[in-house]
Amino acid sequence: MSKKEVIIYTDGACSGNPGAGGWAAIILFQDYRKDIYGREENTTNNKMELTAVINGLKVLKFSCNINLYTDSLYVKHGITEWINKWKMNGWKTSNKKSVKNMELWKELDNVASQHEIDWKWVKAHSGDKYNEEADSLARKAIIDA
């Protein structure tokens, strides 16, 4: 049986950095759509971007082929370029400092390993329908305490 083809759009937002933050993921499968979002206090934009991706992937019950869209180069470069070096270096950066948001990166690495993911970067606020909607949901999460 072939894997299901899924599209996920994610976004994170912060009111102040650090400050109250929101995250959102839009999961698209055939004609099905699921929106998830949440809020955290005293967080950062990067933590919210990572949380959005993690929670979007956790919704999936089976191993899938995923096109995952993020407007965060931090997330895209982290998962596609930096993470293997961090793991080889004991979760240290090239400057020998601990990786920021290490626990979230470890969790993302774990949930991402269950799927085939094509990581795609989309420019924020460029008119991409689902990126704009994910942004709106993440911002709504901050307000809807």
From Swiss-Prot:
Xref: InterPro entries: RNase_H (IPR050092), RNaseH-like_sf (IPR012337), RNaseH_domain (IPR002156), RNaseH_sf (IPR036397), RNaseHI (IPR022892)
Catalytic activity: Endonucleolytic cleavage to 5'-phosphomonoester
PROSITE patterns named in the record: RNASE_H_1
GO MF entries: magnesium ion binding; nucleic acid binding; RNA-DNA hybrid ribonuclease activity
EC number: 3.1.26.4
Cofactor(s) listed in the protein's UniProt record: Mg(2+)
UniProt-annotated binding residues for Mg(2+) 2: D11, D135
UniProt key word Ribosomal protein: no
Subcellular location: Cytoplasm
GO cellular component: cytoplasm
UniProt domain RNase H type-1: residue ranges: 2-143
Record-listed Mg(2+) 1 binding positions: D11, E49, D71
GO BP terms, alphabetized: DNA replication, removal of RNA primer
Keywords, sorted A to Z: Cytoplasm, Endonuclease, Hydrolase, Magnesium, Metal-binding, Nuclease
Cofactor note text: Binds 1 Mg(2+) ion per subunit. May bind a second metal ion at a regulatory site, or after substrate binding.
Keyword Nuclease: yes
Role: Endonuclease that specifically degrades the RNA of RNA-DNA hybrids.
HAMAP family with a match to the protein in the record: RNase_H
Family, similarity comment: Belongs to the RNase H family.
Complexes and interactors: Monomer.
UniProt name for this protein: Ribonuclease H
Record organism: Wolbachia pipientis wMel
Gene (name only): rnhA
